[in-house]
């Protein structure tokens, strides 16, 4: 005999979700570009450089983040602990195959504290995090971690940790005042037909680009926007490793 229920739950169909396409100039489908420009509600981020990159831009409405000119408004996009931890993981990736990644986890902690401290200052930019970590004495870190600074082993440990934090930060540029600050949050709050361009210098490591993409994914998730990675062969590279 079947079970009779006094009422039934009926799930409403989920509304269609907008889509964020992250592409390079040569992998961006023309029909996707046309649809976004016409205001279909989807969004586009283009990562690249050169003539094909600039030819896609509408100078009157599109936005650009150029790591070489330091105009990413990082702290506007990282107001929560989750967002900051996501950025830290992007700057200091950890390969699960690493047999001893303890110094990398320590480096993540140092970077997280630096971001938290610098973010309390008005008008803070990523260059402030770079400078703070660059000027942090190894013996101070060793002492904070509980090492005896008289022991050279503790100081060497701190030097190793700091090197792992400084490496992804050393190419962070000072903000060029001629370049308006650009925020992912503000871009997403604006018209969907506005495209975000991210300049990629082939001579620079992709650490900051990784953090930008991580932030794009996070804010897309919060906005219930599906993300489609369409970079093709133009994958982001960190220290020679494709990710």
What is the meaning of each model-derived region?
Residues 9-11:
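Short N-terminal leader segment in a subset of presequences, especially plant chloroplast
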Residues 2, 13-15, 21-23, 28-242:
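P-loop NTPase motor domains
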Residues 1, 5-7:
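Short hydrophobic short-linear motifs embedded
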């Amino acid at each position: 005999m079947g079970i009779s229920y006094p009422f039934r739950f009926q799930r409403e169909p989920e509304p269609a979700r907008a889509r964020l396409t992250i592409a390079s100039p040569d992998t961006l489908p023309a029909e996707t570009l046309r649809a976004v420009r016409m205001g279909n509600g989807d969004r586009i981020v283009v990562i690249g450089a050169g003539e094909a990159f600039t030819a896609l831009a509408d100078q009157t409405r599109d936005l650009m983040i150029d790591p070489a000119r330091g105009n990413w408004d990082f702290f506007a996009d990282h107001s929560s602990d989750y967002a900051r931890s996501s950025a830290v993981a992007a700057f200091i990736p950890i390969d699960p195959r690493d047999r001893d990644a303890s110094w990398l986890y320590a480096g993540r902690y140092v970077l997280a504290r630096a971001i938290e401290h610098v973010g309390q200052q008005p008008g803070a930019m990523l260059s402030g995090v770079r400078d703070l970590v660059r000027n942090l004495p190894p013996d101070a870190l060793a002492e904070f971690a509980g090492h005896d600074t008289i022991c050279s082993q503790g100081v060497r440990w701190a030097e190793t940790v700091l090197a792992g934090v400084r490496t992804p930060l050393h190419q962070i540029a000072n903000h060029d005042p001629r370049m308006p600050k650009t925020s992912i949050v503000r871009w997403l709050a604006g018209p969907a037909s506005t495209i975000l361009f991210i300049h990629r210098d082939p001579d620079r490591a992709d650490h900051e680009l990784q953090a930008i993409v991580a932030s794009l994914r996070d804010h897309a998730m919060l906005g219930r926007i599906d993300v489609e990675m369409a970079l093709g062969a133009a994958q982001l590279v960190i220290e020679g490793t494709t990710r």
